């Protein structure tokens, strides 16, 4: 199954990735792949995690995630081996995922709900702070204590890189950078719910 759209800038994107830059991948996946990613959580009868305002399904080794990961690593050799993936589906008007870091060398966050479903176009995006957790922090601090992260960011005075929501847009970045989902604002109706698909590549922060 072919999952990636044709593009001519893979070599340039891989160079950016190797240099540590945040890479934006618009029009990343083909229509069939997007349909599968979106509908398998829209129609899910069971979820793995329930949070305040959103739910998650884990994709540790499902065939579709593996195909996407393998194709991406062929195009972007700078990517480390695939670790895991998950999907989040949000209620229509809620807070986004709070500030945290992930134990990966790269995160790929892809948005799979069409733009026509968005209510407030100023919301639903992603904020990334080019700041790594202090070495003495534990997982419960860098992945479960957003207030402590906020204090660190305030102390360092670092500003976020902000990325607007766009259907079929992928954001590829150092997963250990602190990041958060912007507040969510989508139109009413189950089919309009904001769905994100996240892939983790490589490992860091945890031994």
Over which residues does each language-model region extend?
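Non-heme Fe(II)/2-oxoglutarate
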Residues: 2-96
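Catalytic core of non-heme Fe(II) oxygenases with the double-stranded beta-helix
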Residues: 81-207
């Amino acid at each position: 199954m072919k999952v990636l759209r044709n593009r001519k800038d893979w070599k340039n994107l891989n160079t950016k990735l190797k240099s540590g830059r945040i890479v934006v991948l618009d029009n990343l996946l083909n229509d069939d792949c997007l349909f599968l990613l979106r509908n398998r959580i829209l129609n899910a009868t069971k979820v793995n995690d329930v949070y305040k305002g959103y739910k998650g399904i884990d994709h540790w080794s499902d065939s579709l995630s593996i195909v996407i990961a393998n194709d991406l690593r062929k195009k972007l050799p700078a990517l480390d081996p695939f670790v895991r993936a998950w999907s989040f589906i949000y209620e229509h008007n809620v807070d986004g995922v709070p500030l945290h870091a992930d134990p990966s060398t790269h995160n790929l966050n892809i948005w799979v709900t069409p733009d026509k479903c968005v209510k407030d176009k100023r919301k639903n995006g992603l904020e990334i702070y080019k700041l790594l957790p202090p070495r003495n922090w534990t997982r419960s601090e860098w992945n479960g204590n957003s207030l402590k992260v906020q204090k660190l960011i305030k102390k360092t005075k670092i500003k976020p890189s902000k990325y607007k929501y766009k259907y079929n847009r992928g954001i590829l970045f150092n997963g250990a950078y602190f990041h958060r989902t912007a507040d969510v604002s989508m139109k009413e109706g189950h089919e309009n719910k904001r769905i994100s698909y996240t892939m983790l590549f490589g490992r860091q922060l945890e031994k």
